[in-house]
Amino acid sequence: MQQAPVILSTLDKLLNWGRSNSLWPLTYGLACCAIEMMATGGSRFDFDRFGTIFRASPRQSDVMIIAGTLTKKHAEFMRRLYDQMPEPKWVISMGSCANTGGMFNTYATVQGADRVVPVDIYLPGCAPRPETLQYALMVLQDKIRRSKAIKQDAPKRLV
């Protein structure tokens, strides 16, 4: 008499496995890096095999990829899109301009996307190759697998 196999795991591991293998990025292309980001959606790089499906709606996305120069006019709009994304959410800053403002050191440019939203992964380069974005998504998958899926709320003080 054979018994059915038993799979032992934790709910954290199961949730993180599902989240890491179904990343749906919100495309937020602002400049040259957006062209490289668009190339990743083509058949040559095939991000679909990693469970990555680009979405146009923030309510259907869990990853925001900021690609290009962020101006102060765009900063408020980008923050609004970030706030509309469901939890948990992650942000990838793609390219030198999104990371530090790049060569645009003017009054109208935000010197890094991390001044507007919390950034999880920084991609260096001008403009980073699609392979670099692919590697960043794999690093993000690893980061998600190592995180705690179920957040424990801090005990509330009564006094």
Curated annotation (Swiss-Prot):
Co-factor binding details: Binds 1 [4Fe-4S] cluster.
What lineage is on file?
Bacteria, Pseudomonadati, Campylobacterota, Epsilonproteobacteria, Campylobacterales
Q: What do the Gene Ontology cellular component annotations say?
A: plasma membrane; respiratory chain complex I
Protein name in the entry:
NADH-quinone oxidoreductase subunit B
Q: Which Pfam families match?
A: Oxidored_q6
From the Swiss-Prot or TrEMBL record, state where the protein is found: Cell inner membrane
Primary gene name: nuoB
Q: Which domain of life is it from?
A: Bacteria
The scientific name of the source species is Helicobacter pylori (strain J99 / ATCC 700824)
Family that this chain belongs to:
Belongs to the complex I 20 kDa subunit family.
